[in-house]
Structures are given as C-alpha cells and as structure tokens.
C-alpha cells in the first residue's frame, strides 16, 4: 500500500476493563488505570525524544475515551494541540457484539476456548460482532481516502485493530481463519512507526494485555 509519510501507531494505555480481563470492544469504554497513564506518559516521552526539533504530526484517534485520554498525555509531551485531533470511527476496536462487558472467564464458561493462544486472536467470531476482515476493510477504506496526506501521522487506537492496521501497512499476507493481514502482538505501552512498509519500535512496552 503506497502511503506517504510516517505513521506512528500505538494502542491506548491499560484500562479498568483491561485490568479486570473484561471485554470492551468498540462501544463500551472505561478510563485508564494508573498503569495506563504511566504507559501513555512513557510513550509520549519516547516520541518526544524520537522527533527532531520542529517536526509535527497530524493527530488521528479512535473516538473511544480511552484512546483520547492516551493521546492527551502523548500530545502534551510533543507540544501538539489535542483539540486538533481528527476523531476517526474506522480506528475503533473490533466490535465484540454480545461479549461486550463480560469477562473472558465468563464467556469461556459458556462457550469453551475463544482465543487462539498462539496468535492472541479470537478463534471464533463474537456473536453479533465483527471479524478481522471487517476491520481490514474499514481500515483499508481509511488509508485509501487519506493516501494523499504527505504529513507524518500519530494514530492512537486499540489492540486488535492496530494489529490489522500494521499488517496492512507492512504488506503482510492474509492469514486464515482471520481473513486479514495481522501483525504480531505487542505489549501494551508499545509505540511503533511504519515508513515505506518497514516498522521500527519507538517505545517497547512492558505491560501485559498483548494485542
């Protein structure tokens, strides 16, 4: 995919639901924990060190409160105006349908295993929810609509959806049964930059909640 400029990508910091191992998806939202704010703070400091003096970024964010909270901390570090952020619904997390608000343990008590532990991805589709090809389609639409942008971008989003975005930007193959290009999982608190189909780590997170 021919994308101009660099795209810095991070998921939000740890939330109350992340800590409780409870599904959030695209609709439910909970605030960051102290760990989540610390992760955002560390990513912001790392990005400030990465950028050269005078370099600016376009700010793009999922409309979820947890993503916007994370971006507010990062934007302060790099001296950017959070109010100038573009809120982009296509950056939302995967829609987990009927699983939203339930713990992983509760769901597995009803259905058995729902995760492919090797890849850190769902092994079955959430009832009334999305699958990974749905995420890939909405993110492809966003990338194509914004392909004219030459400025560097900072994109704050979510665990599952960020893996699909990275997969698209890196030109990874579509994998079954997920029907989408999906990049490897990274610890929460990690930020990467993708340029010309190559990925570098800006800040390596040390948190859990791999996605």
Predicted regions and their residues:
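Short active-site segment of divalent metal-dependent hydrolases/proteases
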Residues: 15, 161-162
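Phosphate-handling substructures
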Residues: 17, 77-138, 203
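Active-site-proximal alpha-helix that buttresses catalytic centers in soluble enzyme cores
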Residues: 5, 11-80, 130
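Conserved histidine-centered catalytic loops in small-molecule metabolism enzymes
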Residues: 52-80, 84-90, 112-114, 193-211
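Generic beta-sheet signal
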Residues: 7, 57, 149-159
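Short beta-strand scaffold positions
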Residues: 61-62, 137, 156-157
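Active-site signature of alpha/beta-hydrolase-fold catalytic machinery across serine-
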Residues: 73, 164-168
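Acidic, low-complexity terminal tails and accessory targeting/binding regions
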Residues: 1-6, 49, 80, 94-106, ...
């Amino acid at each position: 995919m021919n994308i101009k400029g660099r795209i810095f990508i991070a998921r939000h910091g740890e939330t109350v639901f992340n800590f409780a191992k409870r599904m959030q998806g695209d609709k439910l939202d909970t605030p960051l924990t102290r760990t989540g704010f610390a992760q955002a703070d560390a990513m912001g400091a790392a990005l400030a060190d990465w950028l050269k003096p005078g370099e600016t970024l376009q700010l793009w964010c999922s409309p979820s409160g947890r993503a916007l909270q994370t971006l507010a901390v990062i934007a302060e570090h790099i001296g950017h105006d959070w109010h100038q952020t573009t809120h982009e619904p296509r950056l939302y997390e995967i829609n987990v349908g009927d699983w939203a608000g339930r713990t992983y343990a509760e769901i597995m008590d009803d259905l058995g295993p729902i995760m492919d532990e090797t890849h850190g991805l769902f092994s079955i589709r959430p009832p009334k929810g999305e699958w990974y090809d749905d995420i890939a389609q909405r993110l492809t639409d966003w990338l194509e609509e914004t392909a004219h942008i030459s400025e560097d971008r900072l994109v704050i989003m979510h665990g599952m959806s960020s893996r699909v975005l990275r997969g698209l930007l890196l030109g990874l193959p579509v994998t079954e049964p997920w029907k989408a290009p999906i990049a490897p999982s990274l610890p929460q608190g990690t930020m990467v930059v993708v340029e010309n189909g190559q990925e570098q780590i800006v800040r390596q997170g040390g948190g859990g909640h791999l996605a």
